């Protein structure tokens, strides 16, 4: 093992306690002044790349509560996608999109040396700013604004004065997840080598900033970008525990005016934002999920809202987050919570536990920040990711898609690496040498769906079963540890005895959608129930345009709200439908559903010829 050579230029850090100060995170009652000293940490023979402004790895030493600590930092590789873009608007309303260079950024993850379960999320752009975990406590660090000084403030999260003691909560109130799997203990949330196959997921995220937030930061786009980068850097600390990486693919700032009506009524704004994403943003920017950061106060102490299991759906893969406090950390935790809803996670109840309470999916913001998902959330997420509709987060970035220089220990296999299982103290993969990111002697592979006990599986071994008759199975080639690219039956191919047509790997039919919503006793309602969709109201419609609900045309009525009926028991029929405040697509007919012979519902909720729909 290569031992790093540590050279400390100055070990005297002069900490002292101060009673109260106003910092970027707010009014802090008790903090410590420290002077972090950079420690040179280069393996013997290593050479620092001169063209880099920000090193791939750094170490700083300072004191906390009188005890020296060493903060290890490694650059967050993959924080930005290769096609990262920023969009704002000209005075006449034109979109202006740029692709700024982000290769040599200043955002890091890390840990405290010799501290179990320690994590850190730090920006090193102008001094050290961020948070770290030490002995079970969350500390924040930020530079003090003293000219010609390296002084920083270090303080516990609990010492930040709360601006408003009223309970803050999530706006998702209607959830109906039911478990058909045993709840796993928190200690079981570490994946085994078998479970790691096909478990890593990737969310390509766009964050949109509304006009009120733009004005809240006095039009300072640099400050807004910095806040967003800090939020996404923290998201990756949180989601690493459930094997998800969040890559920022774009920022859009509504600097001139909002592109939708942003209202305090969170469910209305969420619905409008989802509609805008589907009809505007998705058509010009590839991404998996979009979150709207707003500067307005949402109703009823709500901090955020997102559709349950909305990830990958054109209209529902969205969230609405209030930029409610000065601390980026707390806003990041709210966004993590709403992304959890997008990934199928319900609110935790009293039976749910996590490594450190409170858990991310608690329905109310607690007195301390949450960093871990519960056992309940893990099970719900497993159920969601086993649904073919979640496949947009499966695509693994190519090695060349990671724009920063390669770094061994960041869990990404990059150019020049054969494997990457994290730092030596965290690596649990017997196939991979964590120090060199090379395979161990005798190993053929380190990970992948076609890697079993460090050996590439033989050709013909099934690595991805067919989910549906509209999917096809994939088999190992015998040459690679990765399962071949997922292949689906063509859209429009007849399925389920000609009762439906294939759409993105599934066979959506009205009968199954009714059973999913109301149980096995229901059937599809007669046509007269679907006539309600001709109204164009909040409950019965064929979508939304410019903030108004669209009346379904008679030929399109089976592409709007879904109607089902119970078995007749005498008397008239009862047209059953369902609507969710938090999920605009919940209870609507699925896209690709057969609406007439030879016709399917398209993304505009029109019943069109199946041969021209795709």
From Swiss-Prot:
A motif (Metal-binding) lies at residues 337-348. Residues 405-491 form the Disintegrin domain. N-glycosylated. One of its GO terms (molecular function) is toxin activity. InterPro entries: ADAM_Cys-rich, Disintegrin_CS, Disintegrin_dom, Disintegrin_dom_sf, MetalloPept_cat_dom_sf, Peptidase_M12B, Peptidase_M12B_N, Reprolysin_adamalysin. Zn(2+) binds at residues 337, 341, 347. It is found in: Secreted. The heterodimer of A and B subunits is structurally stable between pH 5-8 in the presence of Ca(2+) and Zn(2+) ions. Stability decreases significantly in the presence of imidazole and glycine. Addition at nanomolar concentrations of glycosaminoglycans (GAGs), such as chondroitin sulfate, dermatan sulfate or hyaluronic acid to the buffer, increases its stability. This is Zinc metalloproteinase-disintegrin-like protein H4 subunit A.
